[in-house]
Amino acid sequence: MEHVRVIFFFACFLTLAPFHAFAQVDSYEFDPDFNCVDRGNFTANSTFAGNLNRLVSSLSSLKSQAYGFYNLSSGDSSGERAYAIGLCRREVKRDDCVSCIQTAARNLTKQCPLTKQAVVWYTHCMFRYSNRTIYGRKETNPTKAFIAGEEISANRDDFERLQRGLLDRLKGIAAAGGPNRKYAQGNGSASAGYRRFYGTVQCTPDLSEQDCNDCLVFGFENIPSCCDAEIGLRWFSPSCNFRFETWRFYEFDADLEPDPPAIQPADSPQSAARTERTGKGKGGSKVIIAIVIPILLVALLAICLCLVLKWRKNKSGYKNKVLGKSPLSGSIAEDEFSNTESLLVHFETLKTATDNFSSENELGRGGFGSVYKGVFPQGQEIAVKRLSGNSGQGDNEFKNEILLLAKLQHRNLVRLIGFCIQGEERLLVYEFIKNASLDQFIFDTEKRQLLDWVVRYKMIGGIARGLLYLHEDSRFRIIHRDLKASNILLDQEMNPKIADFGLAKLFDSGQTMTHRFTSRIAGTYGYMAPEYAMHGQFSVKTDVFSFGVLVIEIITGKRNNNGGSNGDEDAEDLLSWVWRSWREDTILSVIDPSLTAGSRNEILRCIHIGLLCVQESAATRPTMATVSLMLNSYSFTLPTPLRPAFVLESVVIPSNVSSSTEGLQMSSNDVTVSEFSPR
C-alpha cells in the first residue's frame, strides 16, 4: 500500500505546484485618489456639515464586519442627512478594513471640505459620502483607471478577446453574489506568448444583480477608451471595480479570511468519520478512508441532486403560482420572470420591518390594499404594499408590477426593491418616498403654498421624462393606463416618480402599434381618455391625455372631477373651464393664486401644452416625444388647441360603451372605473 501513498502525494504536488509557481507578491499600491464631485456645496455651519462630522467621528468605534461592507448615515429626517458607504477588497483582514475606512473618511473630508458628494479610493478600500441616499443605487461616475506593464502589440485581438471573456464570466458570478458579497476571482485560458490571465471583479453588495451587472458592463465598455490591450489594468467607480493581470495577484480562496462558518452539528458524518479513524491502526485507517470517502461523496452527490430537483420543482410551482393567467403570461412573461427571483423577500423580514404591519406605520389605503412604512435591519427605509387577499384584480396588479418594474430603471419611476408571496399574502416592496403623493400637495390649500413655479415646472418635466421612457426608451413599450395625481410620488427633493403599474400594458418595442382594444376598462374617472373610457381603445395617446390633465391640475391646483366645483364654475368640469378661459383670453384667471412668482409666459405655455394633450381626438394629441420637445424648446411653435374631451354633451359617458364590456362600476370616492370579465 506504500505506493498508493506515494502516488497520492505526487498527485497533490502536481495539482498545487503550478499555482505556487506562478504566485507572486502583490506590490499593488497607489496613492489615494480623491474625487470631490461637483454636485453642490454646503456651508461649514450647516446641518449637513454637523451630520457629516458626526458620521466620520462615529467611525472611531466602527466594529469590524465579515464582508467588508459598511452602510452608514447620520441625522434625522429634516432633509440634511449624511449618507456614506465603505467597501474593502476581498482579501483585506477585518481590522485592516476598518482602519482603512477610518483613514479614508478623515482624509476625504479634509480634501473635500465643503463638497456634498465625494469619493476616495485607497489601495485596500473605498469610501464615499453624499447628501442623498446612495444605498442600493448604482453610481458609475467618477471613475479611475490604473495601467501597469506594457501594451500588447502581437496577438492584440486575441488578447482583448480573452481579456473580455474572463471579465464577462466573473461579472456574472459577482452579480449573482447575494446581499452580503458581490465578488469573483478567476483565471482564463492562455494565449500565444502568455501563460494565463487573472482577474477580479467586485460590486458594493447593496446593488441588485442587474445594477451590479450594468455597472461592470459600463466599466468593460470603457476599457478601449483608456487602456485596451494593456497587460495590467485596474478600474474603479463608486459602485464597482475590476482588475486584470497576466500574473496571479490575488490570494487563493483557501488563504482568504473565511466568511462566518455555518454551525456544524456535533454528530455530523465528518465527526463520525474522524472518531472512527482515530480508533484504528495505520493499515485499517487506509482501508476506512478508501471506503468511507467514496461513500460520503456518493451520498453528498445524491443529496445535492435531490435538493436541485426539489428546488427546480418549487421554482416551477412558484413561477406558475405567481404568473397564473396573468395578462403578461406568455412569451414575454416566461422569458423575463427569471430576472425577478433575486427580488424575493421573506415574509418574516417584512413583518419585522413594519412592526407586524402596525397601524402606526400605515401610510395609506387603496382599492387593492394598504401601504406601510418599514425599515430594514441595515437602516434602509421601505414602503410595503400589502395587497388584499380576496382581490382578483389585486393579483393582476401584483403580477404586473413585478414583471414590469423589474425591467425598468429610471429616476422618474418608483423603484421596486422586492416582493413576497406566502400563502394568501401578496406584498410589494418599494423605495420609501418621503413626501407621499402629488395629490396630497396640489389639492391641499396649505401644502400647495410650498410648491412654487420652479418646483411645479420640475414636476411637469419629470413626469414627461418618465412617460417618454415608458413609451419609447425602455426595452418594452409600456402604457400606464392609470396616470393620476395620487400615482405620482414626490421624493425628498420634490422630484416626481411615477408609481402603480398594476393596470399597465406591455408590448414588444419592435411592434408597430397604433391602437389596441381591451374588454377590461379600468382607471380613474377624470383622467381617462374618451376613446378608452367609451370603447376600450388605448394607445400611448391614452397616457398623453392623462398627462395633460395632470399638467392642468398642477397649474390650477384644482381637481378634474368632471362636474365638481371650480370656484364659480359649478356647472363646468376643469378642462372645459380652462379651454373656455383660453378662448376668451382670460386664461390668467385659472392659474393657482398661490403662484405669485414665476414666468407667466412659461406657465401659459404649459397650459397650452396641457390643452393640446387633452384634445378629444387621439390623432390630434402630441406624442410624449413631441411634448418633451415643446417643454424644452421655445422655438417650437405650438398649434392652437381644439376643444378638449368631456365638455358639455360629453360630460356623462354613454351607456352603450362597448359590445365587449359587461359593465362599469364607479365608486363615489375618486370615481375609479373597473370592469369585471364575464364568468
Swiss-Prot record:
It catalyses: L-seryl-[protein] + ATP = O-phospho-L-seryl-[protein] + ADP + H(+); L-threonyl-[protein] + ATP = O-phospho-L-threonyl-[protein] + ADP + H(+). SUPFAM superfamilies: Protein kinase-like (PK-like) (SSF56112). It is a single-pass membrane protein. The modification Phosphothreonine is found at T524. Coiled coil: none annotated. InterPro entries: GNK2, GNK2_sf, Kinase-like_dom_sf, Prot_kinase_dom, Protein_kinase_ATP_BS, Ser-Thr/Tyr_kinase_cat_dom, Ser/Thr_kinase_AS. Residues 30-134, 140-249 form the Gnk2-homologous domain. It is an enzyme of class 2 (transferase). The active site is at D482 (proton acceptor). The modification Phosphoserine is found at S486. Residues 1-23 form the signal peptide. Residues 308-679 are cytoplasmic. Its main location: membrane. Residues 24-286 are extracellular. Residues 260-281, 659-679 are annotated as: Disordered. ATP binds at L363, G364, R365, G366, G367, F368, G369, S370, V371, K385. The keyword GTP-binding does not apply. Belongs to the protein kinase superfamily. Ser/Thr protein kinase family. CRK subfamily. This is Cysteine-rich receptor-like protein kinase 29. It comes from Arabidopsis thaliana.
